[in-house]
Amino acid sequence: MKKVFSTRLLFIIAVALLVSQKMRAQAFDGADDHRVYVGYSHIGKLSGVELGYEEGFNDYLSWGIQANVLFTGDKPDEEGKFLDAYDASFHCNFHWSEVFRLPSRFDVYTGVLAGLKTIGIGCGARYHFSENFGIYAAAHYSPISTFTLSGSRVYYKGEPALSVGLTIGW
């Protein structure tokens, strides 16, 4: 019984190693790239969650959308002030992997973003463990407010935003 288990385990490990040698993990595939990412976000002194989608346009450019929610500790009120902690944005990134001939598992990018609350710039990096799964870290700075009502609390403008999370591609 123990010998059969050991043989099966060795077979599974051998197959996994062979398959992993055939697969090439790439952090950015260009026009064929589609990614969903989810992560922890820290903006100013507040924490939150971000969820986004990114699609490659060519070997150097990608576009995407992103939604952020900050945990302010405020309760929903009648005036709708809790909506001040939400943001949605569009971003366009330039990927430096081809330019600097980085390993295919690693991607460094810079870009611009325009959202419901702010306009800004950002940069980030991704590392992929496999063809579909990886991690990312990003930083953004948004010096310009867009649609803010008078009396609204401004959480996003002028605050550094840092985020880390998981990315899933197909």
Predicted features by range, described:
Residues M1-G30:
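Bacterial Sec-dependent N-terminal signal peptides
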Residues Q21-W63, F90, F94, T167-W170:
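Short glycine/proline- and aromatic-enriched beta-strand/turn motifs that initiate or cap beta-hairpins
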Residues A27-H34, I65-Y86, F106, S145-Y156:
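Flexible, solvent-exposed loop segments that connect beta-strands
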Residues H34-V38, W63-I65, F106-V112, I135-A137, ...:
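Transmembrane beta-strands of outer-membrane beta-barrel proteins
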Residues V38-E50, K75-D84, G111-G122, G151-E159:
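Solvent-exposed loop/turn segments connecting transmembrane beta-strands
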Residues Y40, L51-E55, A88-E98, V112, ...:
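Residues on the lipid-exposed face of transmembrane beta-strands in outer-membrane beta-barrel proteins
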Residues D59-I65, V99-P103, F129-I135:
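Repeated loop/turn-to-beta-strand initiation elements of outer-membrane beta-barrel proteins
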Residues L70-E78, Y127-W170:
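Predominantly the C-terminal beta-signal and adjacent terminal strand-loop region
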